[in-house]
């Protein structure tokens, strides 16, 4: 497969961990019960991608590797065509203005996904080996990620939901 040729072993571990996350969280089940054409469904899908990215990070154990894997899978470009300076990329995330995303997209922008992984990697539980995350830690983390998601994509999408306008 092209994906196997594109990624090194550690990057592939991120992708495998991400996909296992979808399975463990039961993400495929929501498609059965939800209108897949709705804005709400797409917001939920974007949140599920971020949750699964966390398991991908736990699988590869490296923020740099996780971000490289995402950059490669989003662009389809290999190492020879990409210059990886993950630190510079992360610094640019603070300078990025609001990046619009199609409200029908099921995946958050790479900016939101990378910021979410950065926030997750800064969590004390992750740095202790990712064995025990308190619900308070995860709630704080989720609130921070929600701010980013609202700024870059979900906020404008929510405004199109009729119930949100009342």
Task: Please report, for each region that a protein language model flagged, where it lies by residue.
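Catalytic Zn2+-binding segment of zinc metalloproteases
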Residues: 2-13, 19-34, 64
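Pan-zinc metallopeptidase signature
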Residues: 83-166
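Short amphipathic alpha-helical coupling elements at transmembrane boundaries
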Residues: 14-15, 54
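Alpha-helical membrane-targeting segments
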Residues: 32-40, 99-104
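Short amphipathic C-terminal alpha-helix that caps PH/PH-like domains
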Residues: 16-20, 114-117
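Short helix/loop segments within enzyme catalytic domains
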Residues: 28, 35-94
């Amino acid at each position: 497969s092209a994906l196997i040729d594109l990624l090194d072993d550690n990057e592939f571990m991120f992708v495998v961990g991400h996909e296992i996350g979808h399975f463990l969280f039961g993400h495929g089940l929501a498609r059965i019960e939800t209108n897949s054409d709705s804005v709400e469904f797409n917001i939920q899908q974007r949140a599920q991608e971020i949750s699964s990215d966390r398991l991908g990070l736990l699988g590869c154990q490296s923020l740099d590797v996780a971000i490289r894997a995402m950059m490669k899978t989003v662009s389809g470009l290999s190492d020879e065509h990409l210059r990886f300076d993950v630190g510079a990329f992360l610094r640019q995330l603070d300078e990025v203005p609001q990046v619009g995303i199609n409200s029908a997209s099921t995946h958050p922008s790479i900016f939101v996904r990378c910021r979410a992984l950065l926030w997750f990697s800064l969590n004390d539980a992750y740095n202790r080996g990712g064995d025990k995350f308190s619900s308070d830690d995860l709630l704080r983390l989720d609130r921070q990620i929600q701010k980013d998601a609202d700024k870059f994509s979900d906020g404008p999408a929510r405004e199109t939901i009729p119930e949100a306008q009342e």
